[in-house]
């Protein structure tokens, strides 16, 4: 294959992978069990918890100033899988919390909700020409793009014991949806996931649960990673996808530890 052809193919793969990642991972801002992986503080009840407002959550969610090497913006800047949870259909109801995390919504019946998309910064190609050296530069940049990881971070708040109930529903879903589930929405292709597996969580917050979800992307098997963490009456979710994995390449990755650590620090 000619060098120029390889660059065009690389660009197509990068754009296609990014488009799919945005479709499966973006929502917006809303005003409306074995947790903690056997580590940390456990799931003790929150005393008369009061939900934070969307404005308060907005002050506490990560920003670009908090994370070196990442571009951070509202996840609403990308495409939406659906306009609201009501438009998301999950074949097995008990798997709904997982589907909500993967489609950019809060996993429970939240009072307020905000989200952000954190993407590793990749240097743009400096060359514009068609010489061998210029094409090498462009191709290297495309490899960096395809090898990068994108993470959707959300914060949702709950009144009373809603945050604890949400964590239990996520834990129950991870245990009960091991064989996968199907999610669809009006105007979107049906997403079929074939496997859900519990993973070791970060141990952040008052309780946390991590899991991976495997599905098919244009014939290739793709695995994405997620974690849900409770900080008092606020629940943080993290959903990471490797563009290399979406492009059908084997790529071992997880949720960037610095993102979870930074978000936990902002929640106190």
Residue ranges and their predicted role:
Residues 56-80:
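Tubular lipid-binding modules of the TULIP superfamily
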Residues 37-62:
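N-terminal low-complexity, Pro/Thr/Ser-rich intrinsically disordered segments
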Residues 73-74, 79-221:
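A small/polar (G/S/T-enriched), proline-flanked helix-loop surface module common
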Residues 2-14:
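Bacterial N-terminal signal peptides that target proteins for export
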Residues 256-267:
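Short, low-complexity, Pro/Ser/Thr/Gly-rich segments in the mature regions of secreted, periplasmic
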Residues 27-30:
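Bacterial signal peptide processing site
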Residues 194-257:
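A short, solvent-exposed beta-edge/loop patch
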Residues 21-25:
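C-terminal motif of bacterial Sec signal peptides marking the signal peptidase cleavage site
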């Amino acid at each position: 294959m000619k060098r120029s052809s390889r660059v065009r193919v690389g660009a197509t793969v990068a754009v296609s992978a990014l488009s799919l990642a945005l479709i499966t991972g973006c929502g917006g801002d809303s005003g409306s069990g074995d947790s903690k992986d056997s580590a940390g503080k456990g799931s003790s009840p929150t005393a008369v918890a009061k939900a934070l407002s969307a404005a308060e959550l907005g002050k506490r969610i990560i920003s670009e100033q908090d994370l070196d090497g990442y571009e951070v913006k509202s996840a609403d800047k990308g495409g939406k899988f659906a306009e609201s949870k009501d438009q998301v259909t999950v074949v097995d109801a008990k798997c709904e919390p997982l589907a909500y995390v993967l489609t950019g919504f809060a996993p429970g019946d939240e009072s307020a909700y905000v989200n952000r998309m954190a993407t590793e910064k990749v240097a743009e190609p400096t060359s514009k020409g068609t010489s061998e050296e210029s094409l090498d530069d462009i191709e290297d940049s495309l490899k960096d793009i395809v090898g990068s990881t994108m993470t959707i971070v959300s914060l949702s708040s709950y009144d009373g014991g809603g945050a604890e109930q949400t964590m239990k529903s996520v834990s129950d879903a991870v245990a009960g949806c091991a064989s996968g589930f199907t999610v669809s929405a009006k105007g979107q292709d049906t997403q079929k996931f074939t496997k859900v597996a519990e993973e070791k969580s970060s141990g952040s917050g008052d309780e946390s649960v991590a899991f991976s979800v495997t599905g098919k992307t244009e014939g290739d098997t793709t695995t994405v990673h997620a974690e849900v963490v409770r900080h008092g009456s606020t629940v943080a979710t993290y959903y990471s996808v490797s563009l290399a994995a979406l492009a059908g390449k084997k790529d071992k990755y997880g949720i960037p530890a610095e993102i979870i650590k930074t978000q936990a620090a902002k929640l106190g």
